[in-house]
Amino acid sequence: MLDCLKKITFLSLILSLFFLLGGCRNENDECQQVQDSLAFFIDFENECENSMWKNIRRIENDTAYSGKYVCECTPDMMYAFGINFNVDNSIGKSNASMSVSMMINARTLLNSKFVVSIEKDNKTILWKSFPLSDGFIAENQWYENSFSFNIPNDLLKNSKFNCYILNDSKEYFKIDDFCFNLKYFNLPAYIKNVKEYDIPKDLRNIENSDNINLLYSEKEKQILIADDENNIITKPLSLYYSLIINGDTLEMQNSRFDLTTSSRHFITLLQPCRISASDLYIRTENNNVNFNLETKFNEDVKVLKLSLIIPFLNDDFTIYRRNPFVDSCDYQDVYYLDQEGFSLNFDERQLNLYHPDNVSSIQLDVKNMTAHINMDYYYDHLLMRYELLDTVDYYVDNSSTFVKKNSSIKSSFTMSLTDKTYLPRIMPVYDGYESAFIWTEHADWTDIKTHRATYFGSEDIKNIEDATGGFAYYDIPVTKSVFYNNPDSVTNYEKNPDFPGLHSTIKTDDSFFDFLKQLRDNGFDICLHTPEQYTTTIDNLKEALSFMKENFASPSWIDHGYNNGIISNREDLVCDALDSTSQYYTYDLWKENGVKYLFNASYEEMRPRPFVNYIFENNLMRPYPGFGDALPVPKISRLYSYPDIMLWSTPYTLEPGENWGWNYYLAQERLDKIVDFRYVFITHFYAPWVQEKRGYWETKNGKIVAKDGLNDALQRIALMRDEHLLLPMTVADYMTYQQQIRNLEYRVNEDGSVTLKNNNNETIKGLSLISVKEMSLANAKSFNMRKTKNDEEYIIWFDMKPNEELLILINN
């Protein structure tokens, strides 16, 4: 036993050192930063009585792979050799890469499996099996069997691993040299190490505020943030630039600012350099400091990242995650906060930065106590373009922002110093829901029969009030894209000869048009999937957009057919729609016709797919949020040069196939995960596609009907909607709400209360706030309230009229 444990301990130590030294910290590296590891090895050469090993049947064997002993698995052992161990809180926020390898000698190809079971709170949260047949060479010949997979942090902490060989086929075989590894890792940071500047000695107060003060060094030309008693809160602020100029990447950081204006409540600083000039305007108002930053470039540049770097002197953060959840301890190393924020706690007060007015995103490097306020960031707006070329599947990466000479990028945000409080955060979904499910259908290869089947339940049903199944029956709205017309007389025959007629378009099928109007009148979002199957003409594009505006008034658009060819729908967002020199330039026509919420295929199409390594167990959410918050995945995207549009994306196409697939991929446990992570899941699908395998329909008794699996899944979603957990909604409704909350002014008052002002021209319906403490509205304004699914927070929701101001009170 002692020799066995020595071998285990030695290997664990060696592997731990190896992986600790093998970490990385580059912004865009996809390697995983391993913090520690566990390694267990057994070769069965000694009697090993450690309780973590299970069902060891040790025998001497002259054909052992190594040494003289092996572990025997016999037909009477349903549960053969295995290992049990616990994972406690000491792993922090780390994930784990699990790998197992063993040598196997079998008389035949095995049906047995190695099972990994993880339990938490006396409940099995993961059961996964791996075939022992992998690697088989020949009978009675040793072969290596191995596998590995990543396990997210939300499954690891305080969990129990129960791993074993499941010999349910009653087979005989031997194993030797079994090795089990858990290598802990954090997500890649997507933040480069920035320089920290020492605090200069010659500081003077250039603000003299009763709340937040600004300290300036004349010698070093550096600026810092302090409280009303001049206690320093930050190290010197700096600007970080990552630019592409004439094909070369330039990175620089500068903390020197010239003080150009200094008066009570208003300060102007200038940071000049060869490439740009950055003006920092700072205005104090009560307990708030408003930062306005403008960087003007002296030559054409592509911006990869432009950030104001704020290094703090302590790390007692309250972090308002993008989910939205709150972390106030047990932090991750790095957070991508999207448009959320954080508070820094000290003494009896806190410094707040939440719901910024106009920033691209916020990243918080907790490990280095540094905030990156991104004026612009490549990953906030991934965008590809299929240029017109004599090839296929070739795209250029247009994610970096192109800024012309003498043009500028502007940003603004507010920081406040207040009493300790629990800030109410703005929910990404209205009416008090914790999460949302958005169905977006692409119009390809459809027939009126398959439309009626998947929306009304059967091909025979013509009126929505008679629906027996499908989306309309369960009142699950869809953003449904359509073709306007069919000038090329495209038929469905090539996809399915059972549907030889024209594919569905508005102008070629009056019954289809009537079907769409019924959906429109019941809350469905009907938009263009481009005007036609192939590249359209400018006249047809104008006609289609005008018709859709008049009849459906959808602000949405879903690209179709994108690729490099001349027929590949050049009017697409990811083709020529944003190229003002192209005859297929579409941006101005979108604006004229109220189209502003566009599908961005880049997250599906770019190779390698961003963050593809962080998929887990066929969960709908990709990347899986349980791995952590460092990945820069924004809820929505905006483009600097095209301010009138907002982009949304999908991670993949949802094609469950047979009915069993529906009950697997959209099982209750996977839908529950969407709520648990307060996630907005947007799916790309083809319900009426004329091929039964890909479509959401099947044939019963000679009739086309909605698949049973689809109906079961929609019923589960409908029940979760009725429980006020998961809201089925359209792109139009979701994006409108996102636009409205972007225009919602959020100010934290000195006593910790919050003032909201609706700067929209329309009422925000069902504006939802969440907090760990109960909230109320001043002046006895009515509101709704419920507790979250986990019973740990409160959600309130209410309507807010244009220009209305509301005071939110928190019961601290």
Which role fits each region the language model picked out?
Residues 30-31, 189-200, 290-361:
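Polysaccharide-binding surfaces and accessory modules of carbohydrate-active proteins
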Residues 24-202:
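Extracellular and organelle-lumenal recognition/adhesion modules and their flexible linkers in secreted
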Residues 323-358, 376-390, 741-812:
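C-terminal beta-sandwich/jelly-roll accessory domains of carbohydrate-active enzymes
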